[in-house]
UniProtKB/Swiss-Prot annotation:
The active site is at Y221, K225. The chain crosses the membrane at residues 20-40. InterPro entries: 3_ketoreductase_fungal, NAD(P)-bd_dom_sf, Sc_DH/Rdtase_CS, SDR_fam. It is found in: Endoplasmic reticulum membrane. The lineage of its organism: Eukaryota, Fungi, Dikarya, Ascomycota, Saccharomycotina. This is Very-long-chain 3-oxoacyl-CoA reductase. Belongs to the short-chain dehydrogenases/reductases (SDR) family. Pfam families: adh_short. HAMAP family: 3_ketoreductase. GO terms for cellular component: endoplasmic reticulum membrane. Pathway: Lipid metabolism; fatty acid biosynthesis. SUPFAM superfamilies: NAD(P)-binding Rossmann-fold domains. Gene3D superfamilies: NAD(P)-binding Rossmann-like Domain. GO terms for molecular function: ketoreductase activity; very-long-chain 3-oxoacyl-CoA reductase activity.
């Protein structure tokens, strides 16, 4: 009798060992099956399904979208691409002059209406929200893009984070996002109800890999984005019965002023590419296969997200250590650049 036969005979004679082996085999089959289904869903979402038709969100029917952080980068692209789809745009951002230029560009290119609201999200000022409320009064709004956000100027230990930077990040990323949503969402619900649910509403909020993965040296920013994950999922549960889809959009690096990256690459899209992938796949999960009301839309980011979730895990010590080492290195290089600039400036004065 071979050793394998002896092992099988031993297991068969021991009920506990038999059931343990059976359970292990069934569990293994279950895990393999669920992984295969998630991977298949990832491929279908990313590469097979057609782009979402925005007529379901009221495009080309005289409806409006509100876009925050609209003057530059990703926010500007959201405004342009939503206007191209036939939505009039309320542009919300800090710099009036930039908003005016963008409003002119949108109106001339896409023949839709625009409104502008100069809004400093770093100041939790009641006047800001009253002005926004006045601007959208009686408008048939179907879409809100919560794009306004701020990160650290450079990676920094939490205990060394300046109080102003800490307050600004929380105020902009969290307080302003929630309060703007409280102002705009009732208008979206009213528009959906008025249409007798012939159109749906949509609220997209920008998340980040920094919130997906706890990120040392960006602790405040990381926490602020993780908060938006839980908030968006909870809000999705509340508003879905009212005909409003709520989704957190997760991105890795995108070329922008905030990321300080200028050149796009295979894994780093420009704002136009990123927003196009987002609007084309609203309602799908792409890389966020295990998360409710969450989408990682850009294909390279989606594959990275899926790989991390299904290997080491986002909350693992391995992921945390890799993040720690990466951002510590970025901080070291940034401090050297600051030191060099300061030295050159001092030499010029002399």
């Amino acid at each position: 009798m071979s050793q394998i036969d002896q092992l099988l005979l031993s297991i068969a004679s021991n009920k506990l060992a038999y059931y343990a082996l059976l359970f292990s085999l069934l569990f293994g089959v279950f895990k393999l099956t669920t992984f295969t289904l998630r991977f298949a869903s990832l491929i279908v979402d990313l590469f097979i399904l057609p782009a979402v038709d925005f007529s379901k969100y009221g495009a080309n029917r005289g409806n409006w979208a509100v876009v925050t952080g609209a003057s530059d980068g990703i926010g500007k692209e959201y405004a342009l691409q939503l206007a191209k789809r036939g939505l009039s745009i309320v542009l919300v951002s800090r710099t009036q002059s930039k908003l005016e230029l963008l409003a002119t560009e949108i109106s001339s290119k896409y023949k839709v209406n625009t409104k502008i609201v100069a809004f400093d999200a770093s100041k939790d000022d009641e006047e800001n929200y009253l002005e926004l409320e006045k601007a959208i009064y009686d408008l048939p709004i179907t879409v809100l893009i919560n794009n306004v956000g701020q990160s650290h100027s450079i990676p920094v230990p939490f205990l060394e984070t300046e109080q102003k930077e800490l307050r600004d990040i929380i105020t902009i990323n969290n307080t302003a996002t929630l309060r703007i949503t409280q102002v705009v969402a009732p208008a979206i619900v009213a528009t959906v109800e008025k249409s007798q649910k012939k159109v749906r509403g949509l609220i997209l909020t920008m998340g980040s890999f920094g919130g997906l993965l706890p990120t040392p040296y960006l602790a405040t920013y990381s926490g602020s984005k993780a908060f938006l994950q839980a908030w968006s999922a909870a809000l999705a549960g509340e508003l879905n019965p009212k005909g409003v889809d709520v989704e957190l959009v997760i991105s890795y690096l995108v070329t922008s002023a905030m990321s300080k990256i200028r050149r796009s690459s295979l894994t780093i899209p420009n704002p136009k590419q990123f927003v196009a992938s987002t609007l084309a796949s609203v309602g799908r999960r792409n890389g966020a296969q295990e998360r409710f009301a969450t989408n990682t839309p850009y294909w390279a980011h989606a594959i990275m997200h899926f790989a991390i979730e299904n290997t080491v895990g986002v909350y693992s010590k391995i992921a945390n250590t890799l993040n720690f080492n990466m951002h510590k290195s970025i901080r070291t290089r940034a401090l050297k650049k600051q030191e060099k600039r300061s030295r050159l400036a001092a030499e010029k004065i002399e």
